[in-house]
């Protein structure tokens, strides 16, 4: 299994629509020249962006967080260019990009250091072979202060690993529960 380069990422995005919309280079500034958190293709990965749809966790219902029986009322929906995450809380969002992962590929996604250095942790599980959809992102604010997340800017880097052999059963083959997800998707069992 080997990590894939920018050349491979560009080819797969352009020829097989692995990432849509796709940015072939690294973008570090907005069209007006303002500095942003970078996104797009990097040497051995792809920096994904956060869309402007958020679900911010709240404790207004004083419920227990249970992944098998998650209370959708624990979130407040928000749409905007900047999401403010309360202290010691978290928010969910989705990527701008839609992914179609090849059968021989597994990805690992890591948060960008710009956010990590501010106490904001981005968590995403691997994209499995033949999974497709928008990625649900989880942002944890580990600080005692409110924290900002910027929509349409970079939030995490996806690394692509290609196996030497094809898996027997892909995510699509087993009917994975998050296959084809479109918006911010809450836990399923």
Curated annotation (Swiss-Prot):
DCTP binds at residues 112-117, 136-138, 157, 171, 181. It catalyses: dCTP + H2O + H(+) = dUTP + NH4(+). It comes from the Bacteria. Disulfide bonds: none annotated. GO terms for biological process: dUMP biosynthetic process; dUTP biosynthetic process; nucleobase-containing small molecule interconversion. Homotrimer. This is dCTP deaminase. It comes from Burkholderia thailandensis (strain ATCC 700388 / DSM 13276 / CCUG 48851 / CIP 106301 / E264).
């Amino acid at each position: 299994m080997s990590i894939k380069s920018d050349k491979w990422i560009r080819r797969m995005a352009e020829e097989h629509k692995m990432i849509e919309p796709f940015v072939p280079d690294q973008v570090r500034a907005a069209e007006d020249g303002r500095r942003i958190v970078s996104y797009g293709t990097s040497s051995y990965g792809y920096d994904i962006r956060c869309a402007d749809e958020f679900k911010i966790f709240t404790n207004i219902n004083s419920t227990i967080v249970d992944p098998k029986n998650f209370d959708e009322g624990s979130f407040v929906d928000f749409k905007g260019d900047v999401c403010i995450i309360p202290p010691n809380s978290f928010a969910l969002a989705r990527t701008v990009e839609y992914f179609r992962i090849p059968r021989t590929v597994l990805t690992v996604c890591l948060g960008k250091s710009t956010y990590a250095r501010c106490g904001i942790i981005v968590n995403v599980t691997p994209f499995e072979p033949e999974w497709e959809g928008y990625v649900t992102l989880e942002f944890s604010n580990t600080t005692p202060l409110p924290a900002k997340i910027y929509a349409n800017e970079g939030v995490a880097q996806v690394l692509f690993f290609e196996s030497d052999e094809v898996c027997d059963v892909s995510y699509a083959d087993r009917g994975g529960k998050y296959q084809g997800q479109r918006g911010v998707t809450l836990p399923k069992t």
